[in-house]
């Protein structure tokens, strides 16, 4: 485009109307996205779906057949996939709820108009800029039997002998063993999340709270002052003001934090890949990690077609759950 | 949008509270609690930073001591000079360099193209705009994992495995960036651009000369977030980079850990190579980070 041409003659060029000319400019501006999205979003999705309908095993292989929806049936009846889904649902439930409550509590504490709040905000947020790799490596060390986690637990008088990331005992077994040391649950699906898995959950909650705190803080600061003053006149202070005024106004942020949390936790991968590789006895196996091993496995263990089908099932579950969260919270707001 | 208005941090509310002593006590409790929390949030980093100076026996000894018995600065030098098979020279410096240039290239391209596409959506009328924008929002709700791993098969067929192409090309322009920039340009007054436009500047010139300089705060916020996401990216390089020579620091660290499981001090020093630069960036650009809360909030609406 010639920058110096007067607008009138430019608009009349090539026999296009002003509107057509404008539209062409628009498409040129968004062309990077159009090109990128058609290859790497739409193209990849179609390709991924096509792969999921084949019996492709080793990724580089050119030897595969079309087998329809067989992979989807195989995936749903695959024991490892079922275990990984149960694991990740525990993970999402516990991590999402605790990190949302924790982030909100932290934001409320920081929202006060007191000196030093900016410094605390900065200090709280800083650790969350570190990568999941660094966090995982650091906690891998903190969680060893002779590590600092056990050391601090010992200082406050708690049991300090646990090898956190090697313990497959389920939560319900741990509770039962408080009463009967021999307590075991034979069904793998009913044991609850393992000690190793809960250790990773705790780490994840700890590192995500500051990021989500920032979202709540931004929303809290958007609530106009007069609303609190009005509430105060009505006699609503403290907890009552929080439940009747603040929380309803934060509803969109709560939805956002829950949805972001759900999408993130259901795809959890980095921590598992670095810390446990799915062990002990598959109690930290997640769908994302399973899909990864099935895609990149050796020639005998790779099942790329099946892995693609699992990825679509996981995506469908995530979309379904986030949609339900949105609906549920919107409906509950209508009832109020 | 972008930059959250910094509220004046007025000291304690003007009104006098009759229950002054209990208020002072409340404040003391609040500050103590927050200081304690700050210590807890920082503890893992401080403990592992101190751990980098311990010997390999001391670092797994029971009971663990917070301070090293002797400050072994040579641990850092040793980690820096670590060599592994298949890589010429020092691995950590190589991985660090790869992470830096990938982060910078990703940041520059993403910021420029996000701004360009965002400008198109915010300012120019063309058929299908609403539909396309809805499509962008929909792809943001799509879990990244769906295309990530089957993408591996796709790039394998293209011969892109063990090159940087899968880490650069698909992320030239990302939905999050487009969304942020579109909302930002919509919040800018259009008059300045109209003046330039009437003066005969083309749309593109107006975008580069007028709109871009005005959007500095949004561009900086976006740039930091994109650099950080590239710097911290793990699964991408893990999938697409095979040879240790090409790895970034994140996957390099994981590779190093799998090779030298008991070399805790070197693992922790390597972690510091990754964590310290991003922490420095955070403290320098702190105010842009704090505004990212409202940016991300906006992305979710």
Regions inferred by a protein language model and the residue ranges of each:
Chain B
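Short, Lys/Arg-rich, polar N-terminal cytosolic tail immediately upstream
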Residues: 1-22
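A structural signal for multi-pass alpha-helical bundles of membrane permease subunits
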Residues: 6-7, 18, 27-301
């Amino acid at each position: 485009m010639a920058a110096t041409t007067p607008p009138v003659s430019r608009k009349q060029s090539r026999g296009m109307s002003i509107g057509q000319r404008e539209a062409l400019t628009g498409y040129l501006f968004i062309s990077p996205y159009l090109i990128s999205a058609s290859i790497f979003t739409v193209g990849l999705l179609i390709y991924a779906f096509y792969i999921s309908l084949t019996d492709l095993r080793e990724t580089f292989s050119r030897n595969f057949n079309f087998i329809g929806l067989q992979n989807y049936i195989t995936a749903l009846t695959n024991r490892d996939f079922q275990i990984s889904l149960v694991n990740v649902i525990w993970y999402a439930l516990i991590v999402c709820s605790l990190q949302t409550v924790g982030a909100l509590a932290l934001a409320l504490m920081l929202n006060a108009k007191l000196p030093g709040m900016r410094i605390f905000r900065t200090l709280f947020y800083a650790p969350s800029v570190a990568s999941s790799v660094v966090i995982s490596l650091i906690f891998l060390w903190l969680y060893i039997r002779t590590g600092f986690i056990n050391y601090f637990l010992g200082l406050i008088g708690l049991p300090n002998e646990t090898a956190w990331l090697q313990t497959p005992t389920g939560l319900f077994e741990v509770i039962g063993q408080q009463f009967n040391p021999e307590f075991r649950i034979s069904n793998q699906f009913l044991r609850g999340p393992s000690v190793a898995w809960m250790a990773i959950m705790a780490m994840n909650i700890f590192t995500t709270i500051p990021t989500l705190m920032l979202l709540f803080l931004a929303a809290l600061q958007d609530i106009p002052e007069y609303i609190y003053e009005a509430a105060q006149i009505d006699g609503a202070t403290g907890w009552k003001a929080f439940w009747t005024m603040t929380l309803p106004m934060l509803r969109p942020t709560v939805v956002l934090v829950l949805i972001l949390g759900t999408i993130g936790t259901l795809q959890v991968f980095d921590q598992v890949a670095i810390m446990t590789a799915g062990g002990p006895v598959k109690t930290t196996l997640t769908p994302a990690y399973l899909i990864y091993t099935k895609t990149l496995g050796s020639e005998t263990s790779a099942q790329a077609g099946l892995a693609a089908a699992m990825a679509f099932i996981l995506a469908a579950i995530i979309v379904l759950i986030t949609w339900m969260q949105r609906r549920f919270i919107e409906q509950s707001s209508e009832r109020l | 949008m972008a930059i959250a208005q910094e509220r004046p941090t007025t000291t304690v509310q003007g009104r006098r509270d009759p229950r002054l002593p209990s208020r002072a006590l409340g404040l003391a409790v609040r500050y103590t609690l927050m200081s304690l929390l700050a210590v807890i949030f920082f503890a893992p980093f401080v403990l592992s930073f101190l751990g980098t100076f311990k010997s390999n026996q001391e670092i797994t000894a029971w009971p663990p001591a917070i301070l090293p018995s002797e400050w072994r600065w040579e641990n850092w030098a040793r980690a820096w000079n670590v060599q592994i098979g298949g890589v010429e020279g020092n691995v950590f410096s190589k991985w660090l360099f790869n992470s830096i240039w990938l982060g910078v290239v990703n940041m520059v391209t993403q910021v420029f193209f996000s701004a360009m596409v965002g400008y198109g959506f915010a300012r120019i009328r063309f058929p299908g705009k609403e539909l396309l924008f809805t499509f962008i929002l929909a792809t943001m709700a799509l879990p990244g994992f769906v295309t990530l791993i089957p993408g591996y098969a796709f790039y394998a067929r293209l011969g892109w495995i063990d090159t940087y192409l899968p880490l650069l090309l698909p992320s030239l322009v990302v939905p999050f960036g487009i969304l942020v920039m579109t909302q930002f340009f919509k919040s800018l007054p259009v008059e300045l651009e109209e003046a330039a436009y009437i003066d005969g500047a083309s749309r593109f010139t107006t975008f580069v000369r007028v709109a871009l300089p005005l959007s500095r705060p949004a561009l900086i916020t976006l740039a930091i977030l994109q650099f950080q996401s590239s710097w911290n990216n793990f699964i991408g390089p893990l999938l697409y980079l095979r040879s240790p020579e090409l790895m970034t620091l994140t996957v390099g660290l994981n590779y190093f850990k799998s090779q030298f499981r008991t070399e805790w001090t070197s693992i922790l020093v390597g972690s510091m190579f990754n964590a310290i630069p991003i922490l420095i960036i955070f403290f320098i650009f702190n105010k842009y980070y704090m505004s990212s809360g409202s940016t991300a909030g906006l992305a979710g609406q």
